[in-house]
């Protein structure tokens, strides 16, 4: 939730939003625009006038920092000045919002990024229903309050802004198509069985942009890594493909000595191996997760996706595009932000029922391990 909002406003929005154009926006018209798409309280003429003045002071300072080297006023920017001022205001609000939201990471994970409480068999943070440490009733209340704040911002700021911006860039619904094949590992199991069918976000593969059929099941044995264009060598040569648990990481740098301007992409040019499913490159990430969920019949994902497509007046093929990837992050953010409140309620119910187990120590002692073993694990990254 936090990652997609930050990606939209702080890592990606300036591809669509011209900050300099916001300086010529009419504050009253911006207020009217904001109120036409959301009932977010920070929508008054006075508010947008203050934001515009703040931006003007920043520009007049001459110290533009990361905003100094950009394509301001480029004709490819489509938003009107009022849309740019609205987005700029929410860029600033999102900075404050994410500072609050990541308190959930600190409560459950110790820090952000890179949580510190995960370890073999569970988590190190205890359930403490009768104390003041770990997860206790006050912490549950704090988590619920933060989750509600997160959901409100997603519903009233992020999604309306995303739809507003997308409505001015509909041509991008036909641009940026990838390979057309999608893989999602799935996430958020509803029990401890390990059965992929119990994943709240489903697992599977969609080939050929086909949303009419259920996703194909994942077979981890089909995952392969190539080093044909990578600075490594494999036993068996560059044409060999290896499952990660059979993988080799033998450095063999053959690129130019620095400084250099270009890499020869017809040869080896990267430290990254090239993963394939069988011999097929697959798209992963937010769009892949939403495509697989849609094809799998995930009710809420289908509902929100259909609403977004209808609002923009585009068909399902628009998902497989640059615009589709932007929309997919918003769709995923909303459905997970909604679900977070359910998960907090479930955690509270577990604690109230006396189920305070946070760790399974059956395999904690190395003396219980076999002399040799092979295993595999899969997980998703937000972006």
Identify the residue ranges that each predicted region occupies:
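Active-site bordering "gate/hinge" segments
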Residues: 1-382
